[in-house]
């Protein structure tokens, strides 16, 4: 049903064409404001603490007073153990609590651990869950195993958004990126994202984003 036999060169050429045609007309203040409102303000540091996450959340609480002409960010994204801190500190409406889960960022742990971590994050206040696909399963051709994990975690999330990160730099080709995108959406992903930004060989390129579309 879907053509995943893509040429990297063709994708790059198409992206270059889109950039040339579309960037100038979208380089406007309204578009930039819209994009700002889509941001997940994120802290995923090994040095994060209750105090630092509270301070981080207070910045969002104060945002409307400091920037009354801008809409606030879409969400605050933290590790699952800080979900309750954000929930108890956040005072503004319209900003969700997002948590990474499922053995983030490598996705290398037992499915039972992924399920438990996701359930605990939701119990602590998470509105959205960010996971990474099981890249090892995908690259070894175990598509069923990869999809089953996503389906299990979506069942835990229920009505809450499940955002699935493809880690496109590890997938190497436009064909793999499109295939992983389709499989993730088929398995219940509410959103797909390109990369964690934590892996040294992951370089976000425009043609990788195009392959998601």
PLM feature segments, named:
Residues 128-181:
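Conserved anion-binding
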Residues 202-209:
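Conserved small/polar residues in nucleotide/adenosyl-binding loops
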Residues 1-35:
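Charged, compositionally biased N-terminal leader segments and the immediate start
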């Amino acid at each position: 049903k879907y053509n995943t036999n893509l040429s990297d060169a063709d994708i790059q050429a198409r992206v270059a064409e889109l950039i040339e045609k579309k960037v100038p007309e979208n380089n406007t203040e309204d578009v930039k404001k819209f994009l700002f409102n889509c941001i997940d303000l994120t802290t995923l540091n090994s040095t994060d603490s209750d105090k630092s996450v509270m301070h981080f959340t207070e910045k969002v609480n104060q945002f409307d007073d400091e920037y009354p002409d801008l809409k606030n960010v879409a969400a605050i994204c933290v590790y699952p153990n800080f979900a309750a801190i954000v929930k108890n500190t956040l005072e503004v409406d319209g900003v969700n609590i997002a948590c990474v889960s499922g053995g983030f960022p490598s996705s290398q742990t037992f499915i039972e651990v992924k399920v438990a971590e996701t359930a605990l994050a939701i119990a602590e206040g998470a509105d959205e869950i960010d996971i990474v696909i099981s890249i090892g399963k995908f690259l070894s051709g175990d598509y069923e195993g990869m999809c089953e994990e996503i389906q299990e975690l979506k069942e835990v999330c229920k009505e809450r958004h499940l955002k699935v990160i493809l880690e496109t730099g590890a997938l190497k080709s436009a064909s793999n990126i499109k295939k992983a995108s389709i499989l993730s959406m088929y398995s219940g992903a509410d959103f797909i994202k390109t990369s964690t930004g934590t892996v040294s060989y992951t370089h976000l390129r425009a043609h990788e984003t195009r392959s998601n579309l």
